[in-house]
Structures are given as C-alpha cells and as structure tokens.
Amino acid sequence: MAIRISRHAQKQMKWRQITEAEAESTIAEPDMQQDSIKGRKNAFKTLGGRLIKVTYCREGDDIVIVTAVIKRK
C-alpha cells in the first residue's frame, strides 16, 4: 500500500506547514475518523498542539491524500 499526495494537498500542506510524516501519521493512527463526500474519509489527529485534518480516499491498493488542513479546536 502506497500513500500518494495530490498536487492540491501538496500545496495546502506546504502553505500550512504540515509534513508528510504528520499527514501519514494522521491517517495511520487518527484520534477520530469520519466519512466525507465522494467516498472519502476525514482523519483527525492532534500533533504538536495542532488539530490536523487529512481528507483521503482509496484508489485500488493506494491511499491518496486529497487535502490537509489545520482545524481550530
């Protein structure tokens, strides 16, 4: 299983200073998870005092990160 990051997510992660490791950790071990639109999932995790939300979907055996944001608690 590979994790790929969409171009949109790459831009958002760079702008919001979310590392790939933080995004992958959020997906692998979320504090909370919920269904989203179009068969996507939202994973939430608090890391370094920030609540990170990663939206992702499955494409075959791969996981594709659609976007990542910092949420207010």
Language-model regions, residue ranges each:
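Ribonuclease/tRNase effector modules and their secretory precursors
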Residues: 1-73
